[in-house]
Curated annotation (Swiss-Prot):
The gene is kup1. This is Probable potassium transport system protein Kup 1. Belongs to the HAK/KUP transporter (TC 2.A.72) family. PANTHER family: LOW AFFINITY POTASSIUM TRANSPORT SYSTEM PROTEIN KUP, OSMOTIC STRESS POTASSIUM TRANSPORTER. Pfam families: K_trans (PF02705), K_trans_C (PF22776). It catalyses: K(+)(in) + H(+)(in) = K(+)(out) + H(+)(out). The lineage of its organism: Bacteria, Pseudomonadati, Pseudomonadota, Alphaproteobacteria, Rhodospirillales. Transport of potassium into the cell. Likely operates as a K(+):H(+) symporter.
Length: 640
């Protein structure tokens, strides 16, 4: 049985064929404000880092044109061809992001255990690195913007770090209030940003048109082969031009594929190209400009207004990354890779606008440590690349699995694309691994730490589920016993027992029978299932089955972009003739007390870690939005 459809089917909003011209323009403007903040602020530091004095690369015409060519072709290959044209085809019912892609890849394997394990590990590590990226992006972006003050006068040098911290703390403090109002300004501000950097670059390109030779990839290849090892090191800075590429895919569900692609080709790509070429042309004319070519493009009268605009742009870029981490955290909870978290909606209209306190303050703590510890965008650049390139490589592999297994692309085509994409991704990753001791250790440490937490949680929950299933009574046997029994007293009201399995009796019910020796007039077994799709429509949300006199089984399905709301679900059951009066309904939940096993499946330290994570998880009452006054918790001791 099914409920009537009352909400839009999953993925429908991404159907670009239904988007009108005005709607397409509005979505493209919004995408410019959210999706392109990160990659749009990369010109602040990319070429500056490529010509870092530590690299020992002189600002000769051949080197300048060669590096400009590498930056241009990195953007074309990684962002335009890989993300905009290839990876964005792999939408999970309209949604993107590495965990959504992981769910697609697992589905594509058809349950092949030899593939599922490595793919899960790869996807989780990519997701963990994305969280590391979420710490570094706000730190390096805002730092690099405010460092523009130093170009005007050295007087501001001591104030760069304090001003950066003030901006970042303010940004994270407002998260709990939502960003709906200020978010309306993101698009227009970023349009002004892109038009401004394009105009600044165009001025220099017109004066030095021979910089356009950088469009020829031969100049980039010549630079690589001529400088060998040093060129390989420089590639670790070139990759900064494509940071934010993952955001295009991660935010696809908010805007749809076509608006993001339209914004890229119509404004973002031309603006970035003009600005990078303009910076390179400036260095050709004045090699001293290599110390901060972005701000040296700006006329003296416009420096401080540009610092303000750049700060606004980097705050917007930071907001996009913060929202991405919140979204990823929600997906991790729903897909079973994280303990339950306190997830709060900050908008009545936009489902994607959420606030997660633990993620928010954890990010801020890491960012403050980065700013105070590294002190400059140049120092942070070493830490930035590893997180970005690691996630990009993981995305490439997962997308290729989907292309071959789900889209039935021929193996030779997938291998060919994989060879090109992975050569670039792994080349960038290798160049950044050279910087592990200079700061690259930070995102690796964050990534490995988050991977450990997610893997431990998933493993621990699997063990716990098996332990509970081992001692569970089959539901059909229990129902037969109830038919034959006349000794169990039935009392007024409805009892809802939440259970993870649909064919076993909840342990909480058995404990209730054992201690209270009664059953309610109506007994409901409620199972909540999270599907590997972003959203489940209302018409497919609930299935109600009558098991026997007074016994019902309700199965509820959600997507990994949706949060459970049990009272709302129970109201939907009225369509099945099953009506709930909250003041007459009791919810029985089992609270597990975990104890170490004599034959552990995990090392003792991981068991302890899992226990700590379990204790700190948000209660089932709060997570499922069950009225606290109607909940009865029954303690259950479970041996891991």
């Amino acid at each position: 049985m099914e409920t009537p459809a009352t909400e839009k089917p999953a993925g429908e909003k991404s159907g670009t064929e239904k988007i009108g011209v005005k709607r397409l323009g509005a979505l493209s403007l919004a995408a410019i404000g959210v999706v392109y903040g990160d990659i749009g602020t990369s010109p602040l530091y990319t070429l500056k880092e490529c010509f870092d004095p530590d690299h020992g690369i002189p600002s000769s015409p051949e080197n300048v044109i060669g590096i400009a060519s590498l930056v241009f072709w990195a953007i074309i290959l990684v962002v335009t061809i890989k993300y905009v044209l290839f990876v964005m085809r792999a939408d999970n019912r309209g949604e993107g992001g590495i965990l959504a892609l992981l769910a697609l890849a697992i589905r594509a394997t058809g349950g092949d255990r030899g593939l599922v394990g490595p793919l899960v590990g790869l996807g989780l590590f990519g997701a963990a690195l994305f969280i590391g990226d979420g710490m570094i992006t706000p730190a390096i972006s805002v730092l690099s913007a405010i460092e523009g003050l130093e170009v005007g006068t050295p007087f501001f040098a001591p104030y760069v770090v304090p001003l950066t911290l003030i901006v970042l703390v303010a940004l994270f403090t407002i998260q709990s209030h939502g960003t709906e109002l200020v978010g309306r300004l993101f698009g227009p501000v970023m349009v002004v940003w892109f038009l401004t950097i394009a105009a600044l670059g165009l001025t220099e390109v017109v004066g030095h048109p021979h910089i356009l030779m950088a469009v020829n990839p031969a100049y980039g290849l010549t630079f690589l082969f001529t400088h060998g090892w040093i060129a390989f090191v420089v590639m670790g800075s070139v990759v900064l031009a494509v940071t934010g590429g993952e955001a295009l895919y991660a935010d696809m569900g908010h805007f749809g594929k076509l608006p993001i692609q339209m914004a890229w080709f119509a404004l973002v790509l031309p603006a970035l190209t003009l600005n990078y070429f303009g910076q390179a042309a400036l260095i050709l004319d004045n090699p001293e400009a290599a110390r901060n070519p972005f701000y040296m493009l700006v006329p003296g009268w416009g420096l401080y207004p540009m610092v303000i605009l750049a700060t606004l742009a980097t705050v917007i870029a930071s907001q996009a990354v913060i929202s991405g981490v919140f979204s990823l955290s929600r997906q991790a909870v729903q897909l079973g890779y994280s303990p339950r978290l306190d997830i709060r909606h900050t908008s009545d209209e936009e489902e994607g606008q959420i606030y997660i306190p633990r993620a928010n303050w954890g990010l801020l703590l890491g960012i403050v440590a980065l700013v105070v510890g590294f002190k400059s965008s140049s120092n942070l650049a070493a830490a930035y690349g590893i997180a970005v390139t690691g996630t990009m490589a993981a995305t490439t592999i997962l997308a290729l699995v989907v292309a071959h297994r789900s889209w039935n692309w021929p193996l030779w085509l997938c291998l060919g694309l994989g060879a090109v994409f992975l050569a670039v991704d792994l080349g960038f990753l290798g160049a950044n691994l050279l910087k592990v001791t200079q700061g690259g250790w930070f995102p690796l440490a964050v990534g490995l730490g988050m991977l450990l937490l997610m893997a431990t949680w998933r493993k621990g929950r699997d063990i716990l589920s098996r332990r509970l299933a081992d001692g569970a009574l089959p539901l059909d046997m229990f129902m037969q016993q109830q038919k034959d029994s006349t000794s169990i007293l039935r009392v007024r009201g409805t009892a809802v027992f939440m259970t993870g399995g649909t064919d076993t009796v909840p342990i909480a019910l058995l404990h209730n029978l054992k201690h209270n020796k009664v059953l309610h007039q109506r007994v409901v077994f409620l199972t909540v299932i999270t599907e590997d799709i972003p959203r489940v429509s209302a018409r497919d949300r609930v299935v109600v089955e009558g098991l026997a006199e007074g016994f019902y089984r309700i199965t509820v399905r959600y997507g990994f972009f949706q949060e459970p709301d049990i009272p709302k679900v129970l109201r939907l059951c009225k369509a099945f003739g099953l009506e709930f009066e909250m003041m007459d309904t009791s919810f029985f939940l089992g609270r597990e007390t975990l104890v170490p096993s004599t034959h552990p499946e995990m090392p003792e330290w991981r068991e302890r870690l899992f226990v700590i994570m379990s204790r700190n998880a948000v209660s089932a009452t709060d997570f499922f939005r069950i009225p606290a006054g109607r909940v009865v918790e029954l303690g259950i001791q479970v041996q891991l």
